Amino acid sequence: MLQNSGIRDIVIKEICDIAEKYEIEKVILFGSRARGDYKKTSDIDLATCGGNHVLFALDVDETTSTLLKFDIVNL
């Protein structure tokens, strides 16, 4: 599924590393990037379960190596 998301591998790794740092149990990609019908400038929609959602969201927004915007929700 991530192969068709248009998200670079390094950004996926950064998100995974940050999720581990804040003890996020699950990160779910949803929206246009999950469906594969995204545009070049589409944001990255993520849902999280567990851990420190607020710090995770701030860290992802500030430290990942992409100019794309994130929309992160807590389940």
Name these PLM-found stretches:
Residues 17-18, 34-37, 60-63:
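Short, flexible, glycine/charge-rich loop motifs used to bind or transfer phosphoryl groups or to couple energy/partner
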Residues 24, 30-32, 56:
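Short amphipathic beta-strand starts and helix->beta connectors
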Residues 1-27:
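Helical scaffold of the NTase/Pol beta-like nucleotidyltransferase catalytic core
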Residues 31, 36-53:
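Catalytic metal-binding acidic patch
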Residues 2-3, 8-11, 48-75:
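Metal-dependent nucleotidyltransferase catalytic core
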Residues 22, 39-43, 65-67:
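Short connector loops at helix/strand junctions that flank enzyme active sites
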Residues 26, 39-41, 61, 71:
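Residue-level signal for functionally critical sites in structured catalytic/ligand-binding pockets
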